[in-house]
Amino acid sequence: MTASSGTPPHQTVERARELREQLGTAQHEYYVLDRPTLSDQEYDRLFRELQGIEAEYPTLCTEDSPTRRVGAPVQSAFSPHRHLVRMLSLDNAFDLSELEDFEQSLKRVVGDAIHTSGYTVELKIDGAAVALTYREGVLVTAATRGDGTDGEDVTANVRTIRGVPLRLHGDNHPPLMEVRGEVYLPFAGFERMNEARVAAGEPVYVNPRNAAAGSMRQLDSANTAARPLRFFGYAAVLPDGSAPARSQWELLEQLSAWGVPVAPHRQRCHTIQEAEAWATVVEHETRATLGFAIDGGVVKVNDMALQDELGIRADRTPRWGVARKFAPDMALTKLRRIDVNVGRTGVLTPFAVLEPVDVGGATVTFASLHNADQIAAKDLREGDTVQVVRAGDVIPYVLGPVPEQRDGSQQPWSMPTQCPRCNTPVERYGDDVAVYCPNVACPGRQLEGLVHFSSKDALDIDGLSYARIQQLLDAGLVHDVADLFDITVDQLTSLERFAKKSAENLVAAIAAAKQQPLSRLMFGLGIRHVGAQAAQLLSRQYGSLDALMNATAEQLGAVRGIGSIIAQSVASYFADPTTRALMERLRARGLRFDEPNAVQADGVLTGATVVLTGTLPSLSRGEATALVEQAGGRVTSSVSKKTTFVVAGEEAGSKLDKAKELGVTVLTEAELLEKLSGASADASADASA
């Protein structure tokens, strides 16, 4: 599109402003609130529309436009940047005793005032520190920590991180301020990035922290934009060294209100013992569920006035804070051998058999190796000394070998050419990195398929453990999922270690699983590419298994949130005569083939576009969205002339103002529920007539 040198029409100016607002709101909901209301497809459509407007009228491309995140080549090497105030590093504490020593050092300066203040405790993100300078609420500079006084200007790269606000929300921000935080890579994104590097023949990153730091120093920010980086803020300073808040807790709340992502699981603690209790829970329970790396917690004096009074030590560490470090989440051990597991779809997955080693407080004997390409890229050999990581990951994985410790006895490894469970020649499809066993009767595939079918997110069959399923397979009692529903108490009690009560409980649990809704059955079938969310979307849209089985790939792909790959996979699965025979066997055994929360084709909100804003009295955002969608409506994130109505709660803000301005109907939660219950009453009356 050729750029226009003329003045853009008023409606185009307004549309560009509206798009920037919609996309900014969507990014805030996704990256900060973790409550997205705009689908990826809708976001991409709006993004492309804004790109088109800005290409035609370059004067409409503002500094805070979401399109400015895409990335552009840096013209020269990184320039030095002087921080507004020196970035400090915290001292460390490794247990309660050292935290108590820290508190005693505080009391020597401020006495018992520390008890009035208390502490704010936060996660210590294992990433790359950056400082973001905002002038009049607009991001103007981003820099690395450097030596604490001077860092490197990485503005072009940081602008590509969607969680970093290009313009702060609200209008109560200082004229000039530096927001500090950590750029990090979630574990899932780190794995995807390394897989892409393997496919491209590039060396893999050793850990997420190194990957985040390396991403900040890309000379072409388009490379940074392609990486799934995230950001958490933890501090803000003004030019005079003060903070724009009276307490650390208030500062974190203010950062969040400005649209800056803040790490979860922060807490106010009245005593240092409470801070240690928090750290213990985070280290041994929370850490494994986070999905990103942390290497400890941070304990800070909450009162900012006391922080100022405490000041810094001669070694340039602040007296008012300390890092409560956790046990290392990486360890070295011996890679005894590499074995291969066969998954439910036939994928052969190599895994490491290790000499037992303590990693992050747990003994690790097995670890993930992902696929043969990654093993080759890392040059892993049986007998190697390897680095094993468990941080934040339920399944430990091998980062790489320690080549310096090789003595010549280590042996290279290659993927077997035959399935280790059934000896069928393996196959590799196109450019897929995975290797498959094509035999649907493979014992390995049968075992993993049954385990998945009975898992918690599928039919949730209590008592049907991995070992029990293996026992049933070995006894010839089951070969596929339909066979489970033919098992009797007498058959089970004839097996070893199966008491009558246990057998009765398992048969009862299998019978109860017949009443699970279609969405759980769909997920349990183990259709390639179909996760729990996709299964739920399809089941709610079609309402019955028969309707799903008869849908074409094109029809399935039209369901919001279902892409062409999933649609084709589902259509191909149900087109297979073997699958259809299995479905009839399940039907004959009384399984439920309908979805109770299916979208109503003629629902009261069919065709309606609804916006939810503010805090509703009793419904969460997710619950309200589900009710609207079940009634046939669609929930969007922004108000326009096409909006049917807005449901407003407390602190509704700009969306409510926009609705009133456009004359869009505004409902309370009670009015929404009345509208929905009225539809239910009408339906009941029709049914009884």
From Swiss-Prot:
UniProt GO MF annotations: DNA binding; DNA ligase (NAD+) activity; metal ion binding
Matches recorded under SUPFAM superfamilies: BRCT domain, DNA ligase/mRNA capping enzyme, catalytic domain, Nucleic acid-binding proteins, RuvA domain 2-like
Coiled-coil boundaries: none
Pfam families in alphabetical order: BRCT (PF00533), DNA_ligase_aden (PF01653), DNA_ligase_OB (PF03120), DNA_ligase_ZBD (PF03119), HHH_2 (PF12826), HHH_5 (PF14520), Nlig-Ia (PF22745)
GO cellular component: cytosol
Residues holding NAD(+): D40, Q41, E42, Y43, D44, S89, L90, E122, R145, E182, K300, K325
Protein name as catalogued: DNA ligase
The organism's place on the tree of life at top rank: Bacteria
Cofactor annotation: Mg(2+); Mn(2+)
Keyword Ligase assigned: yes
Sites where the protein binds Zn(2+): C419, C422, C437, C442
Domain BRCT intervals: 600-689
Family, similarity comment: Belongs to the NAD-dependent DNA ligase family. LigA subfamily.
Main function: DNA ligase that catalyzes the formation of phosphodiester linkages between 5'-phosphoryl and 3'-hydroxyl groups in double-stranded DNA using NAD as a coenzyme and as the energy source for the reaction. It is essential for DNA replication and repair of damaged DNA.
EC number from the UniProt entry: 6.5.1.2
Gene of this entry: ligA
Active-site residues, as the UniProt record annotates them: K124 (n6-amp-lysine intermediate)
Example of a GO biological process term: DNA replication
Keywords of this entry: DNA damage, DNA repair, DNA replication, Ligase, Magnesium, Manganese, Metal-binding, NAD, Zinc
Organism: Gemmatimonas aurantiaca (strain DSM 14586 / JCM 11422 / NBRC 100505 / T-27)
Catalytic activity of the protein: NAD(+) + (deoxyribonucleotide)n-3'-hydroxyl + 5'-phospho-(deoxyribonucleotide)m = (deoxyribonucleotide)n+m + AMP + beta-nicotinamide D-nucleotide
